[in-house]
């Protein structure tokens, strides 16, 4: 009959009370009477009841998607097991069940925090955090471990390089660790086991939940070049903060990270992967934008003479590149350089394809001169390091795309 029940937490608690009462009475009869019941009979009855109870609990927990309810279920199991263990009934199978419930609890936490992360990313403005006063500055750094000597020297108001999602994400990771820790309470586990449990669940949060949210964010159509640049900056700061998360767990469990077999946090790879994905998306979006400008090109291939200056579409494209790469001044030099190289190579290839188009049957000298003016303009801007941040230097060796 137990296996046919559909239970909520209240009915489970009532079930536990009934079972405990029954077996406490059986235990009392066993020890207070002669020959009325035997230990073998009591053990057989207990094993049968335990199998039914475990089946019901396993089914109940598998359908529970609220971490608070799973936590209540765990607490009931612990009380039930501890009580009957006090009467010498074997409860190892119940503690084994707790490992399954723990996995279910972690899954519900991960789903909950996936929604939290998505909301944070949706509400972020992807702009540096403005701080007007010292109090505001202290409030931010109390939530996120940020230290920059140059920024600290600046007068107020000033801006911090990361956007508002960074301290929010960091705070929520810590909240997840606290929530994960709740399951370990009253389980009679060693500090090392709890430390390992926390680190493994946090790794799942970083490498699966947060990583997926970041990758999905980067691919969203409304995320432009400015937002991608900010995401790269954000992930850099989150990556640097991973060691503080390590310390946070260590302070909770008092288990040294140098202990043999201590699980390390994999946040570094999560944020590096997201950063590389954002960089790749920057290169892709730049090329797509170049294609849009190229589609505006309307050469009169039969024109008698050139206009004497670069084409309007090309100057618009160059102005776009100038303003776009100004946004890249906060990126590592290699990223800005690679983006410039990628954009210029794509532009030169597109111009070459335009000139060698098989549908183009005849070109006048005037059209060739006009096209040549455009190529010269591209070459001039490129060699002046239009697309490169000034700290890379003017002596940088540039491939001859044009």
Which residues does each PLM region occupy?
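Short C-terminal domain-edge/linker segments immediately following a structured domain
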Residues: 139-142, 378-382
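Cytosolic small-GTPase signaling regions in large eukaryotic proteins
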Residues: 42, 49, 63-119, 123-125, ...
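Extended alpha-helical solenoid scaffold regions that build the rod-like backbones
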Residues: 1-88, 136-302, 306, 320-339, ...
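Long alpha-helical repeat scaffolds
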Residues: 312-318
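Alpha-helical repeat/alpha-solenoid scaffolds of the HEAT/ARM/MIF4G superfamily
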Residues: 95, 107-154
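Low-complexity, flexible helical/coil segments
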Residues: 145-148, 382-386
